[in-house]
Amino acid sequence: MGLLAYLLVILLILNVFFAAVTVFLERRDTSATWAWLLVLTFVPIFGFIIYLIFGRKLSGKKIFDWKGQEKIGIQESTANQIEMIRQKEFPFSDPNVKKHRDLIYLLLVNDGAILTQDNEVELFVDGHEKFDALIADIEKAKDHIHLIYYIFHSDELGNRLMRVLERKAAEGLNVKIIYDAMGSRTTKKSFFRTFQKNGGLVRPFFPSKLPLINFRLNYRNHRKLAIIDGDVGYIGGFNIGDEYLGASKKFGYWRDTHLRVHGKAVYAMQTRFIMDWNSASSTHKIDYKARYFPTFHGKGHTSMQIVSSGPDSEWQQIKNGYIKMINAAKKTIYLQSPYFIPDASLLEAIKIAALSGVDVRVMIPNKPDHAFVYRATTNYAGELMETGAKIFIYDNGFIHAKTLVVDGEIASVGTANMDFRSFRLNFEVNAFIYEKQMVQKLEDAFLEDILKSYQLTPELYAKRSLWIKFKEAVSRLLSPIL
């Protein structure tokens, strides 16, 4: 037996060993375990390399480091709210908010997501309007600007925003940017050079520590937050790039959902940014200071919670919030997501609602952002139709919104898609909203989108080719690790 054969045997033994590690040592969902076993078994050696890059869980040390930075300045307020709601003494602003105290309590206990009731919220469904408003707020900034985006492209929109940030940094403002190392992988470091020379600070999230190899590649910071002077915050689905203004020939018009918030909910966005910055940066750590949490004299009436989730937690807070909302539905469930790949618990919750007579409507894109993932989406949509749920295909460009509206009373908007990746692997952030007027605006936007969609009927779905059916089956089988 030659040297090459010996090496091959060793690699195959290692492959079997890591397959065993996947099954017996790492705590993970059963469906994900079986998906990785398939990869390791049927793609030996290369499957092992893929597993090293995409399959390993964050170590206990990394998780501990994250948790050591959590809840800056809000621990006492969280504990007080939990106790007041438990004792039924919390001063809810209106009956609709009080009606959903169980959901509020769940998110408080799971994530420390404080309920704030004095927020003014503006809804954006168009990228031009969102970025015009964001840049106008940045232009008016007096003290600091904090941005975190999964994608920050160096194209026309990226340069337009960067010129403003460079100028504000040169004026002496505290300006910090976090971008995801994977999401913004095509953006060169030189793009930020003038910004940094002017005093701005920028950090990639989970960058590669080795050339061409990043063992944390699978854990992405998918959050999109902007905080200006601790006074105004933005949260939603728009990244920074020309395609989000509808400039992509592939996608055309880009339909997304974003919120501008003025009120105490901005405190939670600020806290989230501080935690992410202190994890991404080994220097220039941010301490809790009053400048980052100014006194509000709110005139708004929107009650909301800012909820974060990620692989640093075992609870999947946003998904649990979705399930609680769906279980509470009596009349309608309106759901939008570019990727609809629910795990068993979420899928069962939606099915039960549909079978109980709730009007369930799910909206997905008419074209793939990621072709392989899209086939899993259509497969799950087809299964859901069997329960009486209605599936709508958005046909006016690309739908990227991550929105859930229930009974016209509660809603969630943010960065989390309805898929395994958002619930288990990505760092996400969503707003959970309890004010009927704001929820009605989100419901109206959904119904307007239906006018630009066509319904996927069982008859239409049955006409897909054998090749499409095969791709759906394979994509669904591997969906827990996509």
UniProtKB/Swiss-Prot annotation:
Enzyme active site: H222, K224, D229, H400, K402, D407
Subcellular location field: Cell membrane
EC assignment: 2.7.8.-
The PLD phosphodiesterase domain, residue ranges: 217-244, 395-422
InterPro entries tied to this protein: Cardiolipin_synth_Firmi, Cardiolipin_synthase, CLS_N, PLD-like_dom, PLipase_D/transphosphatidylase
GO annotation, cellular component aspect: plasma membrane
Membrane topology (UniProt): Multi-pass membrane protein
SMART domains: PLDc
Sequence intervals crossing the membrane: 4-24, 34-54
Keyword set, alphabetical order: Cell membrane, Lipid biosynthesis, Lipid metabolism, Membrane, Phospholipid biosynthesis, Phospholipid metabolism, Repeat, Transferase, Transmembrane, Transmembrane helix
A Gene Ontology biological process term: cardiolipin biosynthetic process
Catalysed reaction, written as an equation: 2 a 1,2-diacyl-sn-glycero-3-phospho-(1'-sn-glycerol) = a cardiolipin + glycerol
GO molecular function, one term: cardiolipin synthase activity
Family: Belongs to the phospholipase D family. Cardiolipin synthase subfamily.
Function of the protein: Catalyzes the reversible phosphatidyl group transfer from one phosphatidylglycerol molecule to another to form cardiolipin (CL) (diphosphatidylglycerol) and glycerol.
Name assigned to this protein: Cardiolipin synthase
Organism: Listeria monocytogenes serovar 1/2a (strain ATCC BAA-679 / EGD-e)
Lineage, uppermost ranks: Bacteria, Bacillati, Bacillota, Bacilli, Bacillales
Record gene name: cls
